[in-house]
Amino acid sequence: MRATDKKLKVACGANTGYLADSQWIGDKTPPTLCDVRVSPNNSVKPNIGAGELAEALNRVLPFTAKEDNRPILQCVKFAAKDGKLTLVSADGFRLAVIALDYDDGEGQALVSRDDLKGIANALKRAKRARVSFERSGDSLDGMSLILDTELIRYKWRSMDGSYPAYEELIPTEFNAFAHFDAIEAVKAVNSLKVPAFSKAYPIDLTFGNGKVVMANPDDKGQAELNADTGGEAIKVRLDGGYLVQALKVCGGMVDFKITNSYSPTLFSSNGYQLVAMPMMTSEASEQAKADREAKAKQAEAEAVTQAEAVAQAHTEAAVLADEQGDEATEDIEPVADKPRRKRKVREPVAVA
């Protein structure tokens, strides 16, 4: 490639072509900036592993939203804070989070999934990588994400908007867990895909006694997988396609944790977390209804207990006040009435 007068000359073998200035820019072209460094001696002080960042991108990009009416969820969130660079993506049904070591300041930016296409492959060929944030334009809250390699600089202006509070969506309490090989689990799920005869196929998972049992609804097929298990025996239903995608992204040994049959499930592997919503079944709906009623009764009972405690406290306070009042009355000595002084009756005086 060689830049000429407002043109870019591209030569590949015997073929030569020219690209005029702004010729490749269309209505849907994202407003990004890409600088090509021509100096082979350009030095980049790395602050993150290029391969590590490439793997992180490949783990979050599949879970961004594809619908144009949700532009914020079409982005990957980059957030640097407390010595970590966290990448977050979500599509409304799944949430992916991965944190990398990063000790070079703080900042955050929302970058469109379309802008990040091909970046992971470019990073795999790069020897050094550096991630930084800078203020964009005159805006006080505008931020740009910059990725430098020894050859190319990428600069993306953050999309305007607020990302959902994803931390609240990651479950922290669980009633059952399993630790197993993701590759073997993918093979087990694929063996159940054939009997389903459908692109969208649900898979029921139950684990306990050192095994994970995967089955099609209506007992069309079943597969077992050795695993380290613990907790209660709970059955949860997941979309088969989502399950395979989650297992492939996790890779290696994976931890799978669930709370009940209707709450979000959690896949985790080496600092990577993937939250997936289960599919609702009649059993899950009944359990959710029963749990809601139980919580309502518990809340009502706690409210009654609290009201009774407050009433009891008021009663005791009133009784104590009465007792203290009686004691104060008894301590006061009665004052004796002073005897009244008799008045002398004046005698009549005779007048001569």
What positions do the PLM features span?
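Structural preference for solvent-exposed beta-strand-turn elements
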Residues: 1-352
